[in-house]
């Protein structure tokens, strides 16, 4: 499904914000 890639993107963006 799309949840896998979306979670990966969310994690990457979150780490960038930190």
From Swiss-Prot:
Residue positions, PTM Leucine amide: 18
Protein name according to UniProt: Antimicrobial peptide 7
Tissue and organ expression note: Expressed by the skin glands.
A GO cellular component entry from the record: extracellular region
Annotated GO biological process: defense response to fungus; defense response to Gram-negative bacterium; defense response to Gram-positive bacterium; hemolysis in another organism
Keywords tagged on the record: Amidation, Amphibian defense peptide, Antibiotic, Antimicrobial, Cytolysis, Fungicide, Hemolysis, Secreted
Main location: secreted
Keyword flag Secreted: yes
Protein origin, superkingdom: Eukaryota
Subcellular location: Secreted
Tagged with keyword Secreted: yes
PTM comment text: Amidation on Leu-18 is required to adopt an alpha-helical conformation in a hydrophobic solvent. The absence of amidation leads to a decrease in cationicity leading to a more than a 10-fold decrease in antimicrobial activities.
Function description: Has very strong antibacterial activity against many Gram-negative bacteria and the Gram-positive bacteria S.pneumoniae and Enterococcus sp. There is moderate antimicrobial activity against the Gram-negative bacterium P.aeruginosa and yeast C.albicans and weaker activity against the Streptococcal strains and E.coli. Has hemolytic activity against human red blood cells. Seems to disrupt the membranes by adopting an alpha-helical conformation.
């Amino acid at each position: 499904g799309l949840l896998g890639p979306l979670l990966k993107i969310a994690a990457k963006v979150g780490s960038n914000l930190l």
